[in-house]
Amino acid sequence: MAFLKKSLFLVLFLGLVSLSMCEEEKRENEVEEEQEDDEQSELRRSLWSSIKDMAAAAGRAALNAVNGILNPGEQ
């Protein structure tokens, strides 16, 4: 009977350790995914910022070109 109790405690202990290790690995994976998401969000923000700046510059250039065509003597 004592052998059975020790075996049962050993199995329960090993199961608990295994579960703990799985939970820890799961948390680490979630943290890594969050970091990757943060990096991707930052890249998207910088990309959109660059696109916005280029569009603004293109708009200003187009406006200047139109003004130059409509008012050739005022430059």
Swiss-Prot record:
InterPro entries given in the database record: Dermaseptin_dom, Frog_antimicrobial_propeptide, FSAP
Keyword Secreted belongs to the record: yes
Signal peptide: 1-22
Cellular component GO terms held in the UniProt record: extracellular region; membrane; other organism cell membrane
Tissues showing expression: Expressed by the skin glands.
Proline amide found at: P72
Propeptide: 23-45, 74-75
Protein name according to UniProt: Dermaseptin-SP4
Higher taxonomy: Eukaryota, Metazoa, Chordata, Craniata, Vertebrata
